[in-house]
Amino acid sequence: MNKFVYLFMFNLNEIRNFSIFITLISMILFSCKKNSNTVKPELHKSYFDVTQGRFIEYEVLEINHDENASIQHDTLRYFLKIQIEDTILDNLGRINNKYVRYKKSNLNDPWMISDIWTIIIDGNNAEIVEENQRTVKMKFPVDTYTNWNATIFTNLSSLDCFYEDIHKARTINGLSFDSTVKVNQGSDRNLIRFYNKFERYAKGIGMIEKYYKDLNISNFDTLNISSGKELYF
C-alpha cells in the first residue's frame, strides 16, 4: 500500500512538472508569435521626399554682415528652386539623386543653375552633400526621442539637432500643410554671439521653411553686429 501511494505521488509530480513545462513552452511560442505580428513603428520618412522630378520654389532673404566691408549689411532677395533630378553614385558607392539648386533675381527671369548637390536617405539618415560637406538633415524615426549631430561626417563643429512641433498643421505664406515638423538646429545668446537655426518640413513635400541667424555681436546687443549671416526661406 505504501509502495503504491509512493508511486502514485511520484507519477503525479511528474505530471505536474510536465504540465508546467508545456505551459512555459506555450507561453514562449505565444510570445514569439505575438512579437512577430507586432506592427513596425512609422518612421515618417515622407517628410524628406526624394522623389525624382519633385521641386519646391522659395523666396529667399539673405543678409551678410561685415563691419569692414563697403556694404556692411549686404541684403539680397532672390528666388530659389530645388529640384530632385537623376541618380548619381557618390564616393561611397551609394545611389544618390542630384539636388539641383536654381536661382533668379526677379520673378520673370529664367532659372539659372546655381549648385548641384546630392541627396539620399541611407538607412535612418536623410543626407545632403552641399559644397562637399555631407550633412544629416533629418534622422528617423521622427519623434521626441530622436536627436543627432548633423555634421558628424564633416570636420565642422558639432551641430546637435532634435525635433519640435511634431506632426503639427501649419500655414506659411497662405499655404496650409496638414503635418509638419521643426528641426531645431540650436539657439544661444551670450556677450559676443547670437544664433538661432531651424528648418521646418512638411510630409510628402520636404523643407518648407528655413530660419538661419548667426551673428557676432557686442555686449548682448543683436543690433550691434560685427559679422554674421541671416538666411530666411
What are these regions (language model features)?
Residues 1-4, 232:
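Generic detector of intrinsically disordered, low-complexity segments in short proteins
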Residues 3-20:
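Bacterial N-terminal signal peptides that target proteins for export
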Residues 20-21, 193:
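Residue-level preference for beta-strand/loop junctions
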Residues 28-31:
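C-terminal motif of bacterial Sec signal peptides marking the signal peptidase cleavage site
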Residues 33-233:
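Conserved functional acidic sites
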